[in-house]
Amino acid sequence: MLFRSFVEYVDHMGSDLSVVNAARVSFASISTSWTDRDGKLLKYLWDHEHTSPFRHSSISFRIKAPIFVLRQWMKHQVGCAWNEQSARYTEIKEGFYYPDHFRLQDTKNKQSSIGSLSDADEDQALILIEEVYSLAYANYQQLLKMGVCREQARIVLPVATYSECIWTASTQAIMHFLQNGRAHV
């Protein structure tokens, strides 16, 4: 379950007016206040995939998600800033991702899943995962108690461990990211 995950607004730079003025610079023109004409231009730019002006405004978010989700997120971005909680500097709190249900691997398409496990197998899968999480976190704590540095103790933690980061991206990059995500849902 992703109940521990969140995405929250932190800050922004620029506005819709920044975007339309970035587009208008091509014609040595600028707008000082928002008009309906600006709204039409903004829509035109996006609808016709003239997206470079959207690079002139950005938004920062605080995100908490399992490490494997954050790594997939980072894989699909260009020109974005990313700062993540460091397991070198902080002790990681216990918290792991648990799937709502388990899917079967598609035998023909290595990138797909199909159907669901039986109820008995679902229960067994959850037990196996819980055992691994508990052991991994107990071992992490024991390594820290032994004096092992956090940088090395963290290697026993699974990628289902939750982490937090600040992500800043241009509005163009955010829209591209969201479109890619929608295409894979």
Label each PLM-derived region with a short phrase.
Residues 1-183:
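Family-specific signature for flavin-dependent thymidylate synthase
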